[in-house]
Amino acid sequence: MSQEFLDFELPIAELEAKIEALRSVSQQDQQINLDDEITRLQKKSAELTQKTFANLDAWQVSQMARHPNRPYTLDYIEHIFTDFQTLAGDRAFADDQAIVGGLARLEERPVMIIGHQKGRSIKEKVKRNFGMPAPEGYRKALRLMQMAERFNLPIITFIDTPGAYPGVGAEERGQSEAIARNLREMSMLKVPIICTVIGEGGSGGALAIGVGDKINMLQYSTYSVISPEGCASILWKSAAKASTAAEVMGLTASRLHELKLIDSIIEEPLGGAHRNYDTMSNNLKKRLLADLADLDKLDQETLLDRRYKRLMSYGYC
């Protein structure tokens, strides 16, 4: 996968381009030794990357959350879990490809995985509806969660959506009802639920698989009731004010952790999760295992009581 750079990363991109050019020259003519210059530029690039990512603002984090090369749910399933078996359909209307789910093993322990999937190529993005689920997607998710409860399996969800699909067909089939039902049912499921925002956490589309006992966010993910562009369009009548909106919305992992709306922030590799899938997956796996170990200590009554108190605490300082 070719590396793509965001606008604020352009100085880094220029250095990386110079490094690649020098490598190409060195490979074409073995008599030319450019190792020292390449090493110098690599060091400079690493320092610039460190400096850039130490001071990202909320709008830049929003761009990172949407990075086209960012790992999606299926990438984490491939890197973290074994024996994944896809389960499809809501048993009522269709199999929504914007939601993927199924049975897998985490360190030999059976779990149920559910997550949004955006797609990379144009064809796959259309197939996945750009990660925006319809009601049948959320009903599929609920079916899998209820199956997990029957077999006493922990539920692990990965959140990455700009929001639930707002199309006419989705509304006709009960989009708001499907989301609301998931919120209610997830609050009462008798098995541990671990939710992780891996990219965009957009409004009710994210919440519909986001009620749990542990709520985590990747370092450069976002979680909000609306996109910065949408907020800017409403408040300032212009999407051009998106960067201002992002700052006031408090959508970053660090801000939400300060507000105690999430439990932990999972560190990303320098430059973002897309720079190193293996490192990111290892960091996420460690968090999931630690959360499962923590929740395993609780009996069912305590688990549900803690989840209820978490939900009731939202909105209170």
From Swiss-Prot:
<dbReference type="GO" id="GO:2001295">
    <property type="term" value="P:malonyl-CoA biosynthetic process"/>
</dbReference>
<dbReference type="GO" id="GO:0003989">
    <property type="term" value="F:acetyl-CoA carboxylase activity"/>
</dbReference>
<keyword id="KW-0444">Lipid biosynthesis</keyword>
<feature type="domain" description="CoA carboxyltransferase C-terminal">
    <location>
        <begin position="33"/>
        <end position="294"/>
    </location>
</feature>
<dbReference type="GO" id="GO:0016743">
    <property type="term" value="F:carboxyl- or carbamoyltransferase activity"/>
</dbReference>
<comment type="pathway">
    <text>Lipid metabolism; malonyl-CoA biosynthesis; malonyl-CoA from acetyl-CoA: step 1/1.</text>
</comment>
<protein>
    <recommendedName>
        <fullName>Acetyl-coenzyme A carboxylase carboxyl transferase subunit alpha</fullName>
        <ecNumber>2.1.3.15</ecNumber>
    </recommendedName>
</protein>
<keyword id="KW-0067">ATP-binding</keyword>
<comment type="function">
    <text>Component of the acetyl coenzyme A carboxylase (ACC) complex. First, biotin carboxylase catalyzes the carboxylation of biotin on its carrier protein (BCCP) and then the CO(2) group is transferred by the carboxyltransferase to acetyl-CoA to form malonyl-CoA.</text>
</comment>
<dbReference type="GO" id="GO:0005524">
    <property type="term" value="F:ATP binding"/>
</dbReference>
<dbReference type="InterPro" id="IPR001095">
    <property type="entry name" value="Acetyl_CoA_COase_a_su"/>
</dbReference>
<dbReference type="InterPro" id="IPR029045">
    <property type="entry name" value="ClpP/crotonase-like_dom_sf"/>
</dbReference>
<dbReference type="GO" id="GO:0009317">
    <property type="term" value="C:acetyl-CoA carboxylase complex"/>
</dbReference>
<dbReference type="GO" id="GO:0006633">
    <property type="term" value="P:fatty acid biosynthetic process"/>
</dbReference>
<keyword id="KW-0275">Fatty acid biosynthesis</keyword>
<dbReference type="InterPro" id="IPR011763">
    <property type="entry name" value="COA_CT_C"/>
</dbReference>
<keyword id="KW-0443">Lipid metabolism</keyword>
<keyword id="KW-0547">Nucleotide-binding</keyword>
<comment type="similarity">
    <text>Belongs to the AccA family.</text>
</comment>
<keyword id="KW-0963">Cytoplasm</keyword>
<dbReference type="Pfam" id="PF03255">
    <property type="entry name" value="ACCA"/>
</dbReference>
<keyword id="KW-0808">Transferase</keyword>
<keyword id="KW-0276">Fatty acid metabolism</keyword>
<comment type="subunit">
    <text>Acetyl-CoA carboxylase is a heterohexamer composed of biotin carboxyl carrier protein (AccB), biotin carboxylase (AccC) and two subunits each of ACCase subunit alpha (AccA) and ACCase subunit beta (AccD).</text>
</comment>
